[in-house]
Amino acid sequence: MAKNIQAIRGMNDYLPGETAIWQRIEGTLKNVLGSYGYSEIRLPIVEQTPLFKRAIGEVTDVVEKEMYTFEDRNGDSLTLRPEGTAGCVRAGIEHGLLYNQEQRLWYIGPMFRHERPQKGRYRQFHQLGCEVFGLQGPDIDAELIMLTARWWRALGISEHVTLELNSIGSLEARANYRDALVAFLEQYKDKLDEDCKRRMYTNPLRVLDSKNPEVQALLNDAPALGDYLDEESREHFAGLCKLLESAGIAYTVNQRLVRGLDYYNRTVFEWVTNSLGSQGTVCAGGRYDGLVEQLGGRATPAVGFAMGLERLVLLVQAVNPEFKADPVVDIYLVASGADTQSAAMALAERLRDELPGVKLMTNHGGGNFKKQFARADKWGARVAVVLGESEVANGTAVVKDLRSGEQTAVAQDSVAAHLRTLLG
């Protein structure tokens, strides 16, 4: 017997029972995006490798350790996208969407990183990202955060996420802080773990979010990033905080929040939770005003965020059990008798025409009434429409409310109207 081929470790199948809750959550997210006037953009999952090296940074963990990179048959180096911002910027430049224009875009889809799989962290994972181009004030930063807060309310998880904010300043201010931080860390080099020693010279700001408690204790005496901010960044951050306070959105300033990708400047933020163990970041982003120019476009202010959908689904299921998946089926059409199947299928098509948006499943494969009603229950149907030989002969159908058990014989021409009343 041939050996079964299984999914790649860290790349998961999502089965029908799971995709239903994903669809409801994604529908909620998309409705909110539409209410803010954001437009969808669809992007390739494979890009040229230099795009990510230039955008994310050569010495980041993502580029050094985590990217799925391969050579195609033409000898070109290609990479499965590890994040969405770089590809979105590339598309904006390529198609002339950015220069002297405002764009509010969102995308959704799989990303790929070669990490150690664990709950909430996978090698293929899904993100929803938002990117705004052409606006440089703190008001658009605030709008993005307000948009995410509206998501949490719609999903019933507001009490389980908290907002952390920081400003990492301009590129020049960050370079000055980098020098001061390296000078500090060099004094305690023997107390750093190997990962922090490596990062100290390649990407020292990443030492700030080390998970090592001994390193975190050491950093209590480190120079504060806030002391090195340029005046424009201070004013921008103060304006953002004021807007969030006016909107009633609570936040904490976390001066060790830096984000793991090199393209960020000024505002950075994360929504975090204590309900998912070590994988506490649900949504994160910030400003990247230099990235468009860095990738070959004209200087364009930009801000955005990405949200991990696997973690969001886990969080919703953990803290809001009332948020249920929509039923697969609203109406189940039961047909019994040798000559009823074609009539049942014809009635089903007519009902789909008259009741757009209603989910109707027709029984196939035979079975007595008991078996067919069991199938209706399995699929979560609220109503059954029953056709037997006598109903076909009389031009009627029996409509049964599967919750109350009440049933009514109805002329086939009136079934749609009766169902509208039952389904509300």
Swiss-Prot record:
Catalytic reaction list: tRNA(His) + L-histidine + ATP = L-histidyl-tRNA(His) + AMP + diphosphate + H(+)
Instruction: Please tell me one Gene Ontology term that the record gives under cellular component.
Output: cytoplasm
Does the record carry Cytoplasm as a key word?
yes
Please provide the record's keywords in A-Z order: Aminoacyl-tRNA synthetase, ATP-binding, Cytoplasm, Ligase, Nucleotide-binding, Protein biosynthesis
Q: Name one Pfam family in it.
A: tRNA-synt_His
The record's annotation in CDD domains points to: HisRS-like_core, HisRS_anticodon
Where along the sequence do coiled-coil regions lie? none
What Gene Ontology molecular function terms does this protein carry?
A: ATP binding; histidine-tRNA ligase activity
Output the GO biological process annotations, alphabetical, semicolon-separated.
histidyl-tRNA aminoacylation
- Where does the source fall among the domains of life? Bacteria
Entry's localization field: Cytoplasm
E.C. number(s) listed in UniProt: 6.1.1.21
Quaternary state and partners of this protein?
Homodimer.
Q: Which family does it belong to?
A: Belongs to the class-II aminoacyl-tRNA synthetase family.
Protein name stated in the entry: Histidine--tRNA ligase
- UniProt gene name: hisS
